[in-house]
Amino acid sequence: SKGRADRSVTGLLAPPRQAALKDIHEDVLTEDVADRTYALYGQLVHLLLERAGEQDRNALTEERMFTEVGGWTISGQTDTITLTEDDGWVVSDFKFVTSFKFKRNYSGELVMPAEYEQQLNMYAHLLRENGFKVDGLKIVAIYRDWSKMEAKRDRNYPQLGAETHDVKLWSEEDARAFMEERVRLHQDAETSLPYCNDEERWAKPDKYATVPERASYSTVGSMRLHGRKTLQTK
C-alpha cells in the first residue's frame, strides 16, 4: 500500500507505462485469487518475522515514511530497521523468493538483483529525509523452493533455506538522483504514455540460426544479428 502518497517506493520501480495504465483502469482490474498464493505465504512469513522483531528494543518494524519529490509525495514501508552501536540504522527487507533468485554465477559470485538494490537505497533515502542515519542495507532471503539435495549437488545454489545478503549502500546523492529520475518518468507517463523498454519487458536480443542451402537443419550454435533477418552463405 502507498498510503496517502502519490507513489510508493515499490510503485516507482514498476514500469511507468504499467503504473499509469493501472491508475487509469484501477476500478476494472481483477486478479485470480489462485495467483496470490505465494503472496499470501510471503505475508505470513513477514508477519511472523515482524512479531519477532517487536521483541527487540533496538529494532523498529513496519515503519512507513514519506518525503516530497518533484511535487509528489513518496512513501515507503521498511520491514525492519535496527539501531547500531554508533547510532546508525541498518535496513533489513524480507524476501520470500525462489532459490534461483540468489544463485551464484559460474564464478561463484552473487549478483544482487538490481530491483532489490534500487528498492533498499530508496528506503535509505526516505530514512535520511526523516532524520535517520543509515549504516547498512540487508536482504533476508527465505527460499520457498529450497532443496537440500540441490544444495549438495551445486555449490552455487543457496546452501541454506534462508540467507542474509548485504546490499550496496549508495551515496546520498546517488539515491536522491535515482528517486528523482523515477518520479520524473512516472509523472511524464501521465501525459505521454511511454512504451516499456527491453529490460522492463524481460526481452533479450533476437537470435538466428544459420542454415546451409538445401538443408533442413540448422548448424550447431547461433549468432545475433542486429537489423538483419537473414544470413546467406555460399
What are these language model-derived features?
Residues 1-91, 98-117, 128, 149-156:
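Metal-dependent nuclease catalytic cores that hydrolyze phosphodiester bonds in DNA/RNA
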Residues 46-50, 120-124, 180, 184:
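Generic solvent-exposed, charged/amphipathic alpha-helical segments
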Residues 70, 125-234:
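Metal-dependent nuclease catalytic regions and adjoining charged, substrate-binding loops involved
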Residues 82, 94, 139-141:
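Hydrophobic side chains in beta-strands
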Residues 114, 118-121, 174:
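A general alpha-helical scaffold signature found inside nucleotide-binding enzyme cores
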